[in-house]
């Protein structure tokens, strides 16, 4: 093939015409020290706080310490291949996560990347993990209940939409079980649930996901998992990522329930990062801003006023105590930030009282306004009965000769305690809770043997569902026990008691 000189020159001219000069400008620094998941980087003068930095091999880091001559950066991923002298690029992005409906039903890591093997998540929208909490003007007070399906909680420490209610207790007292039950009970309630697992074993998280799938709860849930094997920065980041995902739904007028399981491990991860970054330690070696770590997260839970969309985020943070010590640093911090706490006791748990809620130490500071009237009608008496029972039970240990009134109170208290027991993954709709508690506080269980209370409860609920559904419907729709409903309910209890032996 022979090319004439003029053809060659025309081909070269075409190539010159097509040529586009492209200059890629990137701010590049140099690693001067690396180790323990922390890198010191020199030369990135315009770097922002919490900006993502790109290390060789695609590993990402987050700038936390902006010092005079270098940047302290935490590495979010494997760092053994990073060495002194490596280039580090600025991305210009503050750390953000994907948000939207595409995440529902998925298990993701704190960066929003799927870890459930179900393929990529198709969403265009991203949100920064950090956001300033809604102000006073944009909020509305808590008035709508968020039913957990657990009698002891919905009756005595009620949770409202937009509330922060702490679940606190030692290890192995059923904290996660309470949270998972609350998620399962949101089926059909139009609530998006987000379960954030911080520092849990991968097998534990897999168990929770299987439970949610088995009860059809993954259809409206997102699981954000930072397992125990992950680097500390990912454990620190996970709650903020979950909250950012929830805020997308809240801003679109939806109700969201977020479980942070648990914030003790997030505080530990933050302590590890801070000490490695050489920040000065404070009490229990935590950095001085560990209170702000949790307050800025939990303040993002809110109920928005209708003109701002009317959505809500309800937060159930979990804190693990050591030997029931509620006065340690992190527990006292989170108790002071939240609107109440559900305290779970080891002794109650071991004695078979499940959920192991300590009625004396548990409180809901705003949820009472959100309780439906029917529950208020029966639960007011319930708290009083239990308080008197605890007082008398302590007193009765010293003397055997008790008068009839005291004996009757002790008997009723024992039955009330029994009626508040509930199996795992068996949440009750609120109207069924009301009728069951009604039987206890109105004295209908006084002549039922203590060991038959559970059987009575199961039988009575089935009887009400099949034969007296109109009473349950009336309580559900009217949200109170009107005199005519009351009379029907008493008649129904009497009718069932005749058949129960």
From Swiss-Prot:
Tree of life domain: Bacteria
Membrane-topology annotation of the record: Peripheral membrane protein
Catalytic activity, EC: 7.1.2.2
Catalysed reactions, as listed in the record: ATP + H2O + 4 H(+)(in) = ADP + phosphate + 5 H(+)(out)
One matching Pfam family: ATP-synt_ab_C
Any one GO CC term of the record: plasma membrane
Top-rank EC class of the record's enzyme: translocase
Residue numbers marked as site, Required for activity: 362
Binding site for ATP: 169-176
Molecular function as annotated in GO: ADP binding; ATP binding; proton-transporting ATP synthase activity, rotational mechanism
Record keywords: ATP synthesis, ATP-binding, Cell membrane, CF(1), Hydrogen ion transport, Ion transport, Membrane, Nucleotide-binding, Translocase, Transport
Subcellular location per the Swiss-Prot or TrEMBL entry: Cell membrane
SUPFAM superfamilies: C-terminal domain of alpha and beta subunits of F1 ATP synthase, N-terminal domain of alpha and beta subunits of F1 ATP synthase, P-loop containing nucleoside triphosphate hydrolases
Record's keyword annotation contains Coiled coil: no
PANTHER family on file: ATP SYNTHASE SUBUNIT ALPHA, MITOCHONDRIAL
Family affiliation: Belongs to the ATPase alpha/beta chains family.
UniProt function note: Produces ATP from ADP in the presence of a proton gradient across the membrane. The alpha chain is a regulatory subunit.
Alphabetized HAMAP family for the sequence: ATP_synth_alpha_bact
Subunit: F-type ATPases have 2 components, CF(1) - the catalytic core - and CF(0) - the membrane proton channel. CF(1) has five subunits: alpha(3), beta(3), gamma(1), delta(1), epsilon(1). CF(0) has three main subunits: a(1), b(2) and c(9-12). The alpha and beta chains form an alternating ring which encloses part of the gamma chain. CF(1) is attached to CF(0) by a central stalk formed by the gamma and epsilon chains, while a peripheral stalk is formed by the delta and b chains.
Descriptive protein name: ATP synthase subunit alpha
